[in-house]
UniProtKB/Swiss-Prot annotation:
Residues bound to Mg(2+): 81, 123-124, 491
One Gene Ontology molecular-function label: dihydroxy-acid dehydratase activity
Annotated catalytic residues: 517 (proton acceptor)
Annotated protein name in UniProt: Dihydroxy-acid dehydratase 1
Source organism per UniProt: Acinetobacter baylyi (strain ATCC 33305 / BD413 / ADP1)
GO-annotated biological processes: isoleucine biosynthetic process; L-valine biosynthetic process
UniProt gene name: ilvD1
InterPro entries (UniProt xref): Dihydro-acid_dehy_C, DihydroxyA_deHydtase, DiOHA_6PGluconate_deHydtase_CS, ILV_EDD_C, ILV_EDD_N, IlvD/EDD_N
Enzyme Commission designation: 4.2.1.9
Amino acid sequence: MPDYRSKTSTHGRNMAGARGLWRATGMKDEDFGKPIIAVVNSFTQFVPGHVHLKDLGQMVAEQIQAAGGVAKEFNTIAVDDGIAMGHDGMLYSLPSRDLIADSVEYMVNAHCADAMVCISNCDKITPGMLMAAMRLNIPVVFVSGGPMEAGKVKFRGNEKAIDLVDAMVVAADDSYTDEEVQAFERSACPTCGSCSGMFTANSMNCLTEALGLSLPGNGSIVATHANRKKLFLKAGELIVSLAKRYYEQDDSSILPRSIATKAAYENAMTLDIAMGGSTNTVLHLLAAASEAEVDFTMDDIDRLSRNVPVLCKVAPAKQDVHMEDVHRAGGIMSILGELDRAKLLNTTVSTVHEKTLQDALNKWDIIRTEDADVYEFFRSSPGGVPTQVAFSQNRYYSTLDGDRENGVIRNAEHAFSKDGGLAVLYGNIALEGCIVKTAGVDESILKFNGTARVFESQDAAVEAILGNEIKAGDVVVIRYEGPRGGPGMQEMLYPTSYLKSKGLGKDCALITDGRFSGGSSGLSIGHISPEAAEGGAIGLVEDGDLIEIDIPNRSMNLKVDDETLAARRKAQDEKGWKPVEERKRKVSKALKVYAMHTTSAAKGAVRIL
């Protein structure tokens, strides 16, 4: 039976000094010997998805204390990708994921904590904490801050639901007046919480449910609803129970690596494909699996993507549907329920809250349960009042959305598409693969042949798009923006949004060794591996080259003969694999260190030593 890790610093005569310091934090005689639970918070006033978390850590701590544990809270950093977008701040976003993972490891191991509650929410925070949980392999429960309510704007006689991406698109569209743009800006992000569509933050919080590491509703109930408070209270109580099961009953089945097995990672990816989640989830699941020493690769993702239908379309794929609508339809447990009925899920895996995923679905899938409390939970609706306060309203929808033929969540027979929401493409530009969010691609351009317009940075591409230099039929190629080449693998939300603004969303493609925001849609292909900075063929593309994209057949190729490519490669080897044009980009020592040790997107951009 394993000893509590915390005994290292709380027991023995030679730990008198450490106990003295613990006492200075408020611990009493009776606390020594109880499990010490790290409350890993990520409160910051910089990020709307985290601005409401300040008091929630102490709420969880009180539940831990009441359940017989000792709670100790600390914070991680949190970068807002939307605020960091479109300038050099985005270079720091992906590297912050690894910094968060390291900081959690440092704090938990330095202080010998026994278990964790991870209070996350936005883009890199949930993945960073997930990587740490896999690395540490101590009992953990994830609970996130929850989605923002969708914005509402009265526009030209109609009211429509909007989000951050809508504000970005209209801002670059000259057909909108300044007053209309301001109305979108003021209405797009009305409350605290992670941006309201199926963007990266919400995608990852949904995937923690599929991995079995969070409670039902974690990915879908809005941040403002009083019922979300129940998740935080339950997390504090549950983590003490899990800690005691492991340390006092020798039950290792509740450890993260025992729950998040390869089958669980496949379930999570299956969910992501079915709901058209962010392409960034590919990076993060690969990275978390690497930390857990699980053999989960791009080949697994490719295999799954060929068999899983699209059962749910949410903004940006379907602009009038947001996370609040997914929750009304039964949330993630109901999407998983439909996948189970389609025999696309492994339900023997375990969770932190039920013995098996099958048990969880029997209790929480609104199609199979008859529990009135579950129905009421999923009727939790947005409040419609701008606020930065968590749990500040208790409005309810009058009915649930249980329509599986035409509703927000579909069954397999009535799927939005039989082909999945994400696809892995291979070809001579991407020998190790690349990713496209097919749920956001118009059917008319699933096959696309176009001529290359090559840019050595995101900034140069944006300038060309806004300068009306990009025409229908072009393939915008943005390179040297990968994990090493950026460094930091910037998101390309501005270029994709501006292509929409210019009316080119269905007439152009954008390919890059960088990545895309969960808010991106259109024929946007990212994560091209190997990247240009590693000698990838994307570094050999020239203006005017023909590029052939064939999503149904999972391919993307540069239509240039092998002899020409070999000659270009020889010339590039002599010059060095770096941008042709000098970029006005300050790369700090911190970013240089990241670039030295990161791997390709195909491996999750994890570190190598």
